[in-house]
């Protein structure tokens, strides 16, 4: 699995133990090893390092049936191009071998040993602002807002608040996000280079950094030049003539999460629902499909039905054993 903003990560025996944190700031001891050769296509990377996930924390590896993650620290001297539509990853050290729009670019800051790529975006609601965000293809959402940045922006009406809840809705390398106070907001405008996005619903994250995630790959080819410290965006043909890309979506009254191999109520955003259900209640049925005995990997790898604009019907099993039907 290729994830920008992550370190190389594999699963053999531990060699040297260090402590790291994931996207939810959950910490774990991990091993550190050296890999003499790592071959991708016809390119050989020599003497690269990799973290080692412990045996009892391999749900991600098991469910997606992968042996590791390839992160940005491997490409510190490379140019990589991600074309999600054609499912193609291009790697080179010569920009002449790639075709991309050199006008629509942003500067990159490469932070830490893993060379995590940060770029500056422009955001606007009532007031305009700029924000340095991590480009993270391991995050499925379009945009995650760090709680630290939210506290700053709230004072200046950068976002419109849609709700507040306690719980979690994301899963990192070391497990699901735990009970944090979260905020759901609406951002009117976001500009990434020359591309304008509108109506972005965003939830705060416990991570220190705001992030642009893999969902941007639905709209654009992305080219990262780690040597030149630049990132380029090429809109797909169906988006080129649009003055803005509208990301409006149906706002749901809850967010889902996973605990004890079950789908649960992760966050309650609609205050009316607080009298009916609680965080941690099991979700047993979604749109007529029973999930009580579904395999955890089937749940984790399935495409989320909460991210489209179609109505969703769920059945929630309360702590008292009552089954409650809800329309979201």
Residue ranges and their predicted role:
Residues 1-328:
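Pepsin/retropepsin-fold aspartyl endopeptidases
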